[in-house]
Regions:
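Class I S-adenosyl-L-methionine
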Residues: 1-41, 120-128, 138-157
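Generic secondary-structure signature for well-ordered alpha-helical cores
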Residues: 3-6, 37, 60-63, 102-103, ...
Length: 158
């Protein structure tokens, strides 16, 4: 920034992610400021989070009345399993939902873009398809940004 911008110029980072939930870009900028080699103001512009886009596109609520929703990473889901009946998972390179057959999944990739992909259904029925779509999309584009909501299927519906 110091080498690219003049004293009266403005720079910006357009970052794909959810700065209110998870975004290391803000932490990096804070670290640069902390070092004191350059001074600048940081403004995070609010937008639509991937979680809001996911639930809107699937036409489901994020929460259920009187029930908690847990937001976690794929790594934590793999380590601890689901800790609530509703779990939002981000950053899951390993499809940690596999085997959670008592959950319905609402999965989305590239949410809000022309390349958006949506799949929903019981994990036991759509899990393999999600893995295939995810692998194909990642190979085609070179990257993937996906998010999903797991919702426990009531025992009476099994």
């Amino acid at each position: 920034m110091r080498d690219e911008l003049g004293p009266d110029e403005t720079g910006a980072f357009l970052v794909w992610g959810d700065p209110a939930v998870y975004d290391s870009t803000l932490a990096i900028l804070d670290e640069i400021l902390r070092r004191g080699n350059v001074a600048f103001d940081v403004e995070a512009v609010p937008g639509i989070s991937s979680v809001a886009a996911l639930t809107a596109r699937h036409r489901v609520g994020l929460t259920q009345v009187g029930r908690p929703t847990h937001l976690t990473t794929g790594r934590r889901l793999a380590e601890r399993g689901p800790t609530a009946d509703d779990v939002v998972v981000m950053l899951d390179a390993h499809c940690s939902f596999a085997g959670l057959d008592d959950f319905h999944i609402y999965w989305g990739a590239y949410l809000g873009t022309p390349d958006e992909i949506l799949v929903s259904g019981p994990v036991a029925e759509v899990g393999d398809r999600i893995r295939e779509l995810r692998d194909e999309a990642r190979a085609r584009k070179g990257w993937i940004m996906d998010t999903y909501l797991l919702r426990r299927i009531p025992a009476a519906d099994h």
